UniProtKB/Swiss-Prot annotation:
Positions annotated to bind dihydroxyacetone phosphate: G199, G233, S234, S235, N275, I276, D277, T278
BP-aspect Gene Ontology terms: glycolytic process
Protein name in UniProt: Fructose-bisphosphate aldolase
Pathway linked to the protein: Carbohydrate degradation; glycolysis; D-glyceraldehyde 3-phosphate and glycerone phosphate from D-glucose: step 4/4
Matches recorded under CDD domains: TBP_aldolase_IIB (cd00947)
Pfam families membership: F_bP_aldolase (PF01116)
Organism: Nostoc commune
Amino acid sequence: MALVPLRLLLDHAAENGYGIPAFNVNNLEQIQAILKAAVETDSPVILQASRGARAYAGENFLRHLILAAVETYPHIPIVMHQDHGNAPATCYSAIKNNFTSVMMDGSLEADAKTPASFEYNVNVTREVVNVAHALGVSVEGELGCLGSLETGAGEAEDGHGFEGTLDHSQLLTDPDEAVEFVEATQVDALAVAIGTSHGAYKFTRKPTGEILAISRIEEIHRRLPNTHLVMHGSSSVPEDLLALINQYGGAIPETYGVPVEEIQKGIKSGVRKVNIDTDNRLAITAAVREACAKKPEEFDPRHFLKPSITYMQKVCAERYQQFGTAGNASKIKQISLEDFAAKYAKGELNVVTKAAAKV
């Protein structure tokens, strides 16, 4: 099976009531771990790369690593997704490099730091949708800024994140604006702001509805029942990995991620894509620290990196099971980008909101 568009997987997930973890990748070991977990659980795969990942690995290296995964595991549907595109040009360069899905994050201006107006967000996202859909490529948009409801601050990831602090009106997606945004842009997926943020330091205490607004997802889903929703910054920050890192010389303070049971609530309310990066970073770090400490005389990097694949595979397999993704890869039928482009052109994939349906 060739690379597939995101819309194919999200439509299947919606029809069958499950969510799909979208794992960020930078290197060979991450891709191997994710695909091993996918084969183990018969799960479809979303591999996503930030601008930072593309710069770190190099366009050609990253593209060929993912294409190698497609060749090695032809029975697993794989999406190649651009995470947090800061401008149309970023999305277009991703499409040129075989990405089958792009995120136009117009919640921030092109500097990836300044919160953007609603009008700006609509305009840049719609521009990308028009170009991408003509090629059969899927588009994810974002409304609201990712950041902590505890502090009002965001966590920059690869240079992407607002500076300073914002109030709750900017940190929570407005349901009315969400309806207007989806109608105006026709995005395939909508990332919503509910109090999550990038990195390991998401919450200083176990999150409750006061600082993790799953109820906002439920409200948006009631207004947009046919729209695929996305949760960003949704690593769960496993306590066992934190403990292992600190046991072998780390110094990560007490911190909390997004509980799996809260993500599962989101999936019941239309969340189809769940972004995860930190959990795999913690798995790598725990494995490498442990291997280095137990055999300090070792100098072959494979001694440190092979355990990291095992640790990440365990995390990924757990998420595939917990989100209901497992068992679905073999049920998804290939549809080409060309066929998707034709469907977009005919209006067959237009998102119809409740508000639009009443008109």
